[in-house]
Amino acid sequence: MPSNFFIPDPEGQVPSAEGYFGAFGGKFIPEALVAAVDEVAVEYDKAKSDPEFARELDDLLVHYTGRPSALTEVPRFAAEAGGARIFLKREDLNHTGSHKINNVLGQALLTKRMGKTRVIAETGAGQHGVATATACALFGLDCTIYMGEIDTRRQALNVARMRMLGAEVIAVKSGSRTLKDAINEAFRDWVANVDRTHYLFGTVAGPHPFPAMVRDFHRVIGVEARRQLLEQAGRLPDAAIACVGGGSNAIGLFHAFIPDADVRLIGCEPAGHGVETGEHAATLTAGEPGILHGSRSYVLQDDEGQITEPYSISAGLDYPGIGPEHAYLKDSGRGEYRAVTDDAAMQALRLLSRTEGIIPAIESAHALAGALEVGRELGRDGLLVVNLSGRGDKDMDTAARYFGLYDTDAEVAADGTGAAEIEGDAK
């Protein structure tokens, strides 16, 4: 019986044998990691054709994660988007609260197949870290999570969740102290402990085979959404919309729709304070081709090729690179990418909360802001599907400060400091 949930990429839509999507991708890594990365590629190739692997992952996705995730129409929210019909793919309802669990369970099974006993991971908003710590608790694996020091403050609740699950959380104090630097430290750890450790990479970036493998574990999002839209709306959408940081939730939604030429694929990047200010993380909007974290893609860099520091109110989108398949979709014209400011995202977060009773993650709110814009362009005949990639519990301190929801300035934040002392915007 074919798998219901683990559906590797269809023939003809895979990267080259060297891991390239057109001019983007590849494997640019130190010699010390070549054997480990190649082992992941070989083991994944075996797993893709192993019915037992598919059966085990399917069982976890159904009975542990709670798939299929719901497809929810949001008419009161859509009324602010010119009346276009808008459906949300509810990855926020998954166990651990985001799409991240899809990839994590797949890679955790691979870790066991490879005989590794320790997992490391990077995390920005903490959702990938929480999902990784969850899977390690489930499978009895040692777990170390690297997280930028600024992000540990912004996402103190998720730090506590990871530690409750038994993970060691290391606050990275180098560089910008955000996601980019957490990835750097995780790679250093992997080099030093490669024999017993698997790096459970959390997005569709990094060296081959990670971009294609992580995408395959997330393809279930779009496969389900496509089927659900045909059942609930009677047709395919005019556009599939998702936020884009590294790009995993977006490619998970987009990929099932790539053969459907009439379905626009729209990624919403973090414009921060505005692309023109330089304080943003809109890599496809303002970046140039370069190499970062083991692959060639678009990168935010200066005239000398040095990586510039990204900024976003969203810890999960605060990254100066992008998955190579997104770079390929952009250059081929199949994908469209728009930049969404902090303010537009936060206004969309509040609007969904107050019209539909759903509090989204700030990451997902960037996609919601994009949907409002696209809906107004399409009008009442438009049909949109938006990937609601995560829930907003983790972002309540940021949102409360942004909108002035605390009763006094002396309110205590999740990490025990005064709310005004925590880094990030207040409004």
Curated annotation (Swiss-Prot):
UniProt-listed Enzyme Commission number(s): 4.2.1.20
Key word Amino-acid biosynthesis present: yes
GO terms for cellular component: cytoplasm
Record PTM N6-(pyridoxal phosphate)lysine, positions in chain: K100
Biological process, per Gene Ontology: L-tryptophan biosynthetic process
Acetylation found in the keyword field: no
Gene3D superfamilies associated with the record: 3.40.50.1100
Residue stretches in coiled coil: none
Pfam families: PALP (PF00291)
Keyword annotations of the record: Amino-acid biosynthesis, Aromatic amino acid biosynthesis, Lyase, Pyridoxal phosphate, Tryptophan biosynthesis
Pathway annotation from the record: Amino-acid biosynthesis; L-tryptophan biosynthesis; L-tryptophan from chorismate: step 5/5
Major enzyme class: lyase
InterPro entries: Trp_synth_b_CS, Trp_synth_beta, Trp_synth_beta/beta-like, TrpB-like_PALP, TrpB-like_PALP_sf
Cofactors: pyridoxal 5'-phosphate
Stored CDD domains: Trp-synth_B
UniProt catalytic activity: (1S,2R)-1-C-(indol-3-yl)glycerol 3-phosphate + L-serine = D-glyceraldehyde 3-phosphate + L-tryptophan + H2O
Molecular function terms from GO: tryptophan synthase activity
Assigned protein family: Belongs to the TrpB family.
Function: The beta subunit is responsible for the synthesis of L-tryptophan from indole and L-serine.
Listed NCBIfam families: trpB
Subunit structure: Tetramer of two alpha and two beta chains.
Name of the protein described by the UniProt record: Tryptophan synthase beta chain
Source species of the chain: Streptomyces coelicolor (strain ATCC BAA-471 / A3(2) / M145)
Gene: trpB
